[in-house]
Amino acid sequence: MARWTVNTSVLRLPVTDHREWDADESERRWRKWVSSKDPSEWGAAEWRKYKKRFLVYDAEDPYKFESYKLPVVDIVDGEPKVIRRGVIAAQQALAGARRGVDLPEDVKERATKLAEKLRKKSDKALEKEED
């Protein structure tokens, strides 16, 4: 049985607004950043690194791609950064857009709160950049 967990570690990452959000392209960059190994050879260290990209993951079964939902992080200049448009896409999915996201309601609520915090963090970063 899945044990969906909200990944608050994304709050420690820097935020940027300077990138369009393409989840598929981002996924390719992310996997390359995680490891040069084929994902079938990944161990616990690679999966811990992979987890940093997502708002929600299944802590019961963290060793498969289906255990991760709502990506918001990409690689920018060789470093992981929260992408503002990725956060917006996650918020929309949590609100039901694009067929929504299949998660228990309590997890959706916590993920929504986390996404709101990330959005506020990105708003502040954007304000600083505009000054």
Residue ranges and their predicted role:
Residues 1-131:
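Extended terminal accessory/targeting regions
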